[in-house]
């Protein structure tokens, strides 16, 4: 559903941003 999609997208976003900040 929408909530599940938003949740997975949020987790991906956090991992993506975290990877950039850790470089």
UniProtKB/Swiss-Prot annotation:
Keywords tagged on the record: Amphibian defense peptide, Antimicrobial, Secreted
Entry coiled-coil feature ranges: none
Main location: secreted
Domain of life: Eukaryota
Tissue/organ expression: Expressed by the skin glands.
GO annotation, biological process: defense response
UniProt subcellular location: Secreted
Recorded GO CC terms: extracellular region
Family: Belongs to the gastrin/cholecystokinin family. Magainin subfamily.
Known role: Antimicrobial peptide.
Protein's recorded name: Magainin-R2
Species annotation: Xenopus ruwenzoriensis (Uganda clawed frog)
């Amino acid at each position: 559903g929408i909530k599940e999609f938003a949740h997975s997208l949020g987790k991906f976003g956090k991992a993506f941003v975290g990877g950039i900040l850790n470089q």
